[in-house]
Design a protein with these regions (language model features):
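Small-residue-centered hinge/linker elements
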Residues: 1-85, 94-101, 105-167
Length: 167
């Protein structure tokens, strides 16, 4: 985090904007991974160091863990609301998937026209193997407690209601 001091001749006091850089893959592991545990002190400091007029988040991330994206984004929103400090996101090269999630926690987003932006969503891929196992007389046994626990099981025929629920 770094503070940007802006001096304007007609203002009597210095206005500061604290900057948080959220760059890299979002996840729980690795030294350079973005995650809530590693970045919570940085984010907390951005909202409490001095009396910032705003907090700027610089985002450059292809995404990653939806849970970590949610935790970081929720922390930023909570602090912004508690301290009544606006948040501005500046997208550098890419803010896709969880990276866009982080940018979307800001009050306003700025991006270069060439930046790659967007694509929050889920992709799920699999195979339909029910005919293969039937051909070889293989019986599959699945035991679950609750509804929709084996949704889109590759060893059963696809159900439209499962597809609709996933979308």
């Amino acid at each position: 985090m770094r503070a940007m001091n802006i001096r304007l001749p007609f203002l009597k006091k210095t206005t500061s904007v604290n900057v948080v850089r959220l760059h890299g893959l979002i996840g729980t592991g690795g030294r350079s991974a973005l995650n809530d545990a590693a970045f919570s002190p940085v984010i907390e400091r951005a909202f409490s160091k001095g009396k910032p007029a705003a907090v700027a988040i610089s985002v450059n991330s292809p995404g990653g863990s939806p849970v970590q994206s949610s935790l970081i984004g929720s922390r930023i929103r909570r602090l912004s609301e508690e301290k009544e400090i606006p948040v501005f996101a500046f997208i550098e090269d890419v803010a896709a998937s969880g990276g866009y999630w982080l940018a979307s926690c800001a009050d306003e987003i700025f991006a270069d026209p060439a930046s790659i932006v967007g694509s929050i969503g889920v992709i799920s891929a699999g195979f339909g193997l029910q005919d293969l196992i039937a051909r070889y007389g293989i019986e599959r046994r699945v035991y679950t407690a609750g509804k929709s626990k084996s949704m889109l099981d590759p060893f059963r025929e696809e159900k439209q209601e499962d597809i609709d629920r996933l979308k």
